[in-house]
Amino acid sequence: MKEHELRSLLGKVKDGKLTRRAFINRMLMLGLTAPMASQMLDFVGVARADTKFNYKPTKRGGGGALRLLWWQAPTLLNPHFATGTKDQDGSRIFYEPLAGWDADGNLYPVLAAEIPTRENGGLAADGKSVTWKLKQGVKWHDGKPFTADDVVFNWEFASDSATAAVWSGTYKDVKVEKVDDFTVRVLFDKPTPFWADAFIGTAGMIIPKHLFVDYKGAKSREAPTNLKPVGTGAFRFVDFKPGDMIRAEANPDYHVANQPYFDTLELKGGGDAVSAARAVLQTGEYDYAWNMQVEDAILKRLESGGKGEVHVVPGGNIEFIQLNTTDPWTEVDGERSSLKTKHPAFSDAAVRQAMMLLVDRKSVEDHIYGRTGVATANFLNNPERFRSKNTKFEFNVAKANDILEKAGWKKGSDGIREKGGVKLKFVYQTSINAPRQKNQAIVKQAAQQAGIDIELKSVVASVFFSSDVANPDTYPKFYADMQMYTTTMSQPDAERFMNQYCSWEASTKDNKWQGRNPSRFRDEEYDKLFRASQGELDPVKRAAMFIRMNDIVVGEERGVIIPVVYRPRAHARSKTLRADISGWDNDTWAIARWYKET
């Protein structure tokens, strides 16, 4: 679609000649997400329908205890340092963004009074600013008022390079100004049609200025409130034992009437996914269990217990293997996996190509994940029409052997291939979880047949996904040759998801390993495409840019990742629990509206 055709369609919607729904459906056919199409309509001033939630309770409280199981336990409760989903989910119990993404990919206001549109004056005609009106009467859990000063402070906090915030990429290229006590303006340096990033969803949780102002920059990790959150959410802090448990109680001053339904909340961490599933589906000890990364055959057997159900929600999450582009075994200036090094084996495209052929994705789907994981060749998988059609996966040990042989990697007396004094011996790490260990074993067995020796390393999940910068075994540090985990797609637009392979997001000592690119992949074409996509209005051109980015990182020539299975979000819940879950936000995004049918 050409730009003039797109503008013509937008004009027809504005003039009432084409319905909003018809426009969005047409954009979906072109491979655009519904939220992106919706933002286009907002940009030209077409009114949106408000998100409707089915919440039945007519008073606050009275629901007793809400019991949650996160088998990867939260270790920190500051959203700006939450590298792992578990810490983001834990933080979201207490902290809120200006807006979030509902299950259909629509924006809904949380701490904002309304979603900015052209119609209400929130979106500038030139596309270079967004004005947010804040909800009034909101209080922090300590009784202090929530104001524009808090919003501006969060931008200052996250954009300060010395803070090394996880979401610095969201905030460093914008400016935020206070208009009045309950209005802020986000300024872009160029027209930005897809503006819904800063202060939204996972990256948008807002911390209180009055408790963090003395802990900006290099002192940010010292703030006592990192472990004792004071937010605006429906539940307020009672106790936190990192790696074990969170306890909270209903916020009597919550800014939404009749919420929350539950009087108390306990999030129990640790254990494993199977025991978490059993505690909800079979014994009924808990109401909700997160991330059912369990063999599907086991889930079906546990569901027969009758206490709960497994729910699968569409999203964009991907289980994948990363190949380290740097040398994890050489230290430079006090840093392993330094950008000043190259991986001794994976710098050879032939070795990377061979590893791609040695991952039996279809077997992983068929024998491990079932309905909760679909074999894929793509990093970017959702929406379906957004997937690259240029890629395919293949499991072929003989072909891998042939590639290595032709590239000069010869088998030694021990059966391990080597070249120039470098042996194909790799450490392959992931978190402790039965499906992941089975996946590792499948890869190890195939690699052995190709003359590659793989040492399997399994790290406790709460350690592997820890936000503790002193921990050497976290996935952002990537002190191994290969690693596997699931990365979550936390918004329906692909921009934030695809920035994980931008060169400026490389995880390094300088940014306290908070960069979103642990593989340290650096590619000039990728960077240029990403920058161009940020200002591209034509949905077809923009989709093509993301598809090309996907093809670069998974491709034979320069690729450094091996997608394994696309993972819709699967969770277990009590049959009486009513919980809104979005594939585009944290599991705890709408916890204020959770309730039980009696």
Q: Where is each model-derived feature located?
A:
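Extracytoplasmic/periplasmic ligand-capture domains
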Residues: 2-18, 22, 26, 50-61, ...
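Protein kinase glycine-rich loop
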Residues: 70-119
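Short aromatic-enriched loop/helix-cap "lid" or pocket-rim segments at secondary-structure transitions
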Residues: 80-82, 198-200, 379-380, 469, ...
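Active-site-proximal polar cores
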Residues: 564
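Surface-exposed binding/hinge segments that line
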Residues: 166-216, 239
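N-terminal export signals
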Residues: 22-47
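General beta-strand recognition
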Residues: 67, 108, 131, 183-185, ...
